[in-house]
């Protein structure tokens, strides 16, 4: 299986779990809002619970504020042709997000960690639509969560990983300096070429990861989950056989 075939497979699988009732042929305002609402849930739900605050009354304000930004990028009305273009866009969206939440009484959620998660996950959801101009998302960042972080810990710079470990690998608490160092390091790792195992039982089955970090996310997000389940199952099976006095599985 090629990386493109695997990406197509994982995108379709992701769409079935997320948007069964959505029409993925039309990236209209309603669907863009849906992408943002799901991204906000990914970014803010846990922080809102811990901070005892509610952000959902602001959903319509947030979606209306960012709608045109995301539509213009996803449809390539706004061209993103260089890495610097995306970095400038990211910073504009980040500043707008932080300002909007802070000015509406949600200072506890006005954190960089939440902003980067909202931006990156929105682009991931947008990528799923047929009329999204995917080449315009080629410089997007890797969304950070438990599974993509597990992947990064296998391949990333040890010094940067140690800094991340100091905050318990909590993406919500990441600062801008560490975040940018991680994203730059991921670019460096991918540029060297990674043949990534895609079969838990047979690690020799591998696929070359692309340079597009959203596409990488679709692959490793699912595979790392499978790895986790597989390794836990092996551990339980070994424990069971050990108790029976059987040396080999």
Describe the role of every protein-language-model region:
Residues 1-37, 90, 98, 102, ...:
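C-terminal accessory module of base-excision DNA glycosylases/AP lyases that mediates lesion recognition
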């Amino acid at each position: 299986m090629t990386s493109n075939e695997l990406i197509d497979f994982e995108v379709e699988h992701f769409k079935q779990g997320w948007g069964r009732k959505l029409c993925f042929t039309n990236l209209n305002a309603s669907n863009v809002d849906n992408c943002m609402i799901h991204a906000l849930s990914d970014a803010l739900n846990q922080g809102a619970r811990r901070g005892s605050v509610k952000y959902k009354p602001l959903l319509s304000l947030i979606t209306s504020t960012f709608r045109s930004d995301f539509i213009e990028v996803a449809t390539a009305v706004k061209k993103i042709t260089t890495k610097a273009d995306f970095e400038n866009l990211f910073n504009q969206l980040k500043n707008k997000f932080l300002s909007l939440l802070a000015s509406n009484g949600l200072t506890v959620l006005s954190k960089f960690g939440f902003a980067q998660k909202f931006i990156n996950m929105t682009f991931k959801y947008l990528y799923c639509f047929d009329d999204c101009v995917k080449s315009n998302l080629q410089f997007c960042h890797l969304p950070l969560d438990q599974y993509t972080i597990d992947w990064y810990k296998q391949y990333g710079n040890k010094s940067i990983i140690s800094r991340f470990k100091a905050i318990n690998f909590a993406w919500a608490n990441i600062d801008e300096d560490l975040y940018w160092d991680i994203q730059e390091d991921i670019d460096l790792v991918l540029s060297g070429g990674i043949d990534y195992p895609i079969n838990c039982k047979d690690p020799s089955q591998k696929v070359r990861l692309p340079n597009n970090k959203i596409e990488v996310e679709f692959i490793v997000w699912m595979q790392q989950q499978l790895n986790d389940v597989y390794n836990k199952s092996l551990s339980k099976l070994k424990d069971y056989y050990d108790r029976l006095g059987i040396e080999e599985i």
